[in-house]
Structure formats: C-alpha cells, structure tokens
Amino acid sequence: MIIKLISQPATFRHPRGWSSQHSLKRKWRSYEIEQYFYTHYAPLFAGHGNLAKLITSDAQNNESETHLALVLSDLNAAGFEYRHQQLSADACKPVLAWLAAFHARFIHQAPDGLWQQGSYWHLATRPDEFSKMAEGPLKQFGPAFDKTLQQCPYRTLIHGDAKVANFCFSADGQAVAAVDFQYVGGGIGVQDVAYFLGSVLSEQDLLNHTEDCLDYYFRELHSALSKQLAPEECEAVCNSWRQLYCVANADFHRFLAGWSPEHFKINRMLQQQTEQAIALVSA
C-alpha cells in the first residue's frame, strides 16, 4: 500500500512567490478532486488502462492544519516499478496509448465532481501570473487560446498533469500506469499529449519526432473511439484535436511565460507551435 498524506497549514509561501488564498484553495481542492476521481471515475477505467486503486481515505480538520490521507494500492508491487525522466520517441508509445485509451473512455463525459477545466495551467487558474506577464503576443492571444480550447465540441476528461514523472513503467517499458490525478477534469486530449511530450522529449526530438508521436496517438485514439462512436464522429474528434495541438502548446507557453519566463521548456518547438496557434486563432 501507498499512503498519500496531505497536510495544509493555514498559511503557505510559494518558493517562486506565487502565494495567495486563490492558489492555496486551488491546491487543497486538487487533493479533494483526486480523492473523488479515485472513488467515482477510476473504476470506470478498469480494463482500459492501469492506475492505482483507492483502498480508503480520511480527512481531518483543526485550527492550524487540514489533513487528507489517501491509501492506494502499490503500483511497484503490481509490476510498474520503473520511473523515467526522458525517453526516446519510440519509448513514449505506451504512455501515448494510455492517454488515448483514457481520452476515448471518457469522451463526452461531463466532469461532475472534477475540475470543469482540467490541468493546473489554464488561464482561469493563473490570474496573478497573467496580470504580471510582459505585454506581447502571448498575453494578447492568451484569452483566445483558452477560448478556442474550451469551445471545442469534442471534450473528454484529461489527466491534467501528464508529465512523464506521473507514469510508472514496467521493466520492459511496454506497460504503464498513471498516478497523481489532482488536476483531472474537462478538456481535449491534446492538452495531455502536448504536456507529456514537452516533459519527456529533448528539444531536438520534439522537432524531429512530434508528428510521428501524434500519428501514433491518433491511431490509438481512433481505434479506441471506434468502439463507441460512429466512424464520422471518430474522424471529427481526431481532426479537431489534431488541429488544436498547436493551441494546446501555446496555452502552456502562456502559462510558462507568466510563471517562469526563463523556463527550459520554452524552446524552439514551443515557440513554433505558438506561432501556428496565433495564426489559427487570428484567421
């Protein structure tokens, strides 16, 4: 078993200076949502992909701190004992397949009890960072990126924090399980895909292999969607999401530029994707 124990003090100071009641409440709410996901949604994903099982949970409050404990099954003991910081494009395939299965399983699912907008970086969660951003295209088009993603008619549940560190791998790397569902909620699949690839591939691999990774993800997604949607709707979902991949990247770029403008993830690929997104939302 794994015990995830969260203690929230009455006050908190973020190392980058982003401390506010808004951020404090958002962080605590993320743990409540994770508990809700494991209780109500994780069982619906059984047979589609691997994740931990919630054994029990408990919450306690006092004047100085709030505590929440989640007792989860041990993924290491289940054969997912390996973690990675960087992968080749080919080694990303098991995670892309997991994401495709997750997005297909919850296509058109209302995010009841979860974040209405999944992810920790969407515009509504970052008013302080956005207000302090330097003037420029990212600030100018930030609201348009957000609106474009929200208005996509083909919505699903997204993991919301699908970095490589939140995936556990089998010894041969061919099977994965996901953890940390604090920011699960409504969205479109390429938000997870863009975030994952940006977390795991080198800048050169992003430039050289992003299209190959997207091809693989969309093959897996189409296959999974075809079991529950009509062929024309499968095509519509895949075409819509693929077109919005650049917007998902640009939206994350907007977050990074406000939160940590010197971040290493602001690379040539992210900048290229942002230029494409600006052209798309300006058309």
Task: Locate each region found by the language model.
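Active-site acidic catalytic loop and adjacent metal/ATP-binding pocket
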Residues: 1-2, 145-189
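Generic detector of well-ordered alpha-helical packing
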Residues: 35, 74-75, 160-162, 181, ...
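Regulatory N- and C-terminal appendages and interdomain linkers associated
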Residues: 235-283
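Active-site activation/catalytic loop segments of kinase-like enzymes and analogous catalytic loops
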Residues: 23, 36, 186-226, 248-268
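Conserved ATP-binding subdomain of kinase catalytic cores across diverse folds
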Residues: 1-118
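ATP-dependent phospho-/nucleotidyl transfer catalytic cores
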Residues: 78-159, 168-171
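Short mixed-charge
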Residues: 222-239
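Secondary-structure capping and boundary motifs in well-ordered enzyme cores
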Residues: 64, 91, 154, 158-159, ...
